């Protein structure tokens, strides 16, 4: 009979097969009350599942990450229960867990409304209050088919067809409602009280726009009401920081239907874009990169040689001219290999670092487009390093240091790094993978920061490191990457002459720091809520007069600021100074300069910040020095 070993090393013996819940009850009623599921021999199981042999057991509660995931998954089933009670004609599809929540895809003869969502949420609360047990039944395949046939759940039947090897499946019963899942799920609805439905959107069966359209109901769920309230507060703050709203309020950019996924940059937004580009250009020049420019449209044969045509054609914009097929480039790498291939290269020439602010276009699904965060036309701070196998380690180490320095300049101190290693299907021999993976791991260790290993998550052509930023709301944004490529140099005939006077393929390192300018600017807007550090602010100073008699002096101050490289404007409107200050504060301009008769007479300016702090009266030269110091500190400088 089973001996159960607990995480602290304690053991419990039973003279009969025992469920996870029974083990929890034997430890104490408090633990049993909070038992969501169990981890038996490192495998998640339901609380009702029996343990028949000697095993290790961890009791899973809502405090555990796995417990929270199970709660969210069970909430998705609860959505199904409520929907079927309110809308019997609905057909249930799938309801997975996503980051911080869940969703359920549903077929309905009409779109759900916000009133429908409110009704579904209310019904879910009533079902939770019934405090019913969720019953699991392992069911033979034929019986599963009969259950869903009798209920008219055609999508569930299609999912069963996708699993021909499964002889029995888990059916989870929420009273009269039944759903199919591998589980585990909560044993009782009492664990589901801290939830909220968040939005409705469209989806497609199997994610394919050619298939029938579905409705997707999103929700979030947490271990307790306090966590839920904190999440809702964070989401409300995120909505206030939505880059689309701020972009409109600050006149940065707009999107329109005639050019879906393409950005119309306004003067203010384009200023931020140019500051980023000029900054990255200098960073790359200072670190040994050669800036190049390659064509936007390239003959389709190059994409066939590179392999993109076979694997990426659905995301490529194509065109035809004079009996030739072309593609608008979705990425820059094949073009950079063409530049490398011009002229014979020696091992003495390596590494060669080619950088481009590459304008790319990808035919992303219209439903996935999101402001400037997810677009069809974008510019990458793209570069490719061509090096020998022995140079991988140093190049990666240098890139990691450079990337972390750049992120600090933008005010991001928390950076997550992940190393993705060889998948089962791959090109290149194991010795090359061993060398590349060790080089990347050693470079990460040398950086002195924590990093995460993702076994098997690398691309088929090489391992990679991903860099993710954490913003002020705790959200994580994957931005930078460095990717070893053993494949493209071979496909596109890139080679160099070795020290032994033989030909060999270089290793190609794909790398980007910001990712795309558009998305990175969107991240900055939301991180700073539009209150950009002075070096990124489209307008750094606004000079305002109190009466018309100071207008000429105000323009002279603006001219001097511009002569010294500051981005400055004047506000000479015949309005009260308080009104002008309030209006320019809403525009998030870092410094507001006021000139009255006294300032004109003394040749000074009165300076206040956008937060309302009065910095007092100072000379124009002193103010210029102040701004230049702030700009030099970049994202490390906070305007009080």
Swiss-Prot record:
Chain positions recorded as Zn(2+) binding sites:
333, 384, 510
Instruction: Show the segment(s) annotated as Catalytic.
Output: 242-533
Keywords, A to Z, come to: Aminoacyl-tRNA synthetase, ATP-binding, Cytoplasm, Ligase, Metal-binding, Nucleotide-binding, Protein biosynthesis, RNA-binding, tRNA-binding, Zinc
Identify the enzyme class: ligase
Task: Provide the reaction this enzyme catalyses.
Answer: tRNA(Thr) + L-threonine + ATP = L-threonyl-tRNA(Thr) + AMP + diphosphate + H(+)
Instruction: Describe the function of this protein.
Output: Catalyzes the attachment of threonine to tRNA(Thr) in a two-step reaction: L-threonine is first activated by ATP to form Thr-AMP and then transferred to the acceptor end of tRNA(Thr). Also edits incorrectly charged L-seryl-tRNA(Thr).
NCBIfam families membership: thrS
For this chain, the family text in UniProt reads: Belongs to the class-II aminoacyl-tRNA synthetase family.
> HAMAP family this protein is in?
Thr_tRNA_synth (MF_00184)
Name by which UniProt lists this protein: Threonine--tRNA ligase
Q: What is the lineage of its organism?
A: Bacteria, Pseudomonadati, Pseudomonadota, Gammaproteobacteria, Moraxellales
The gene behind this protein is: thrS
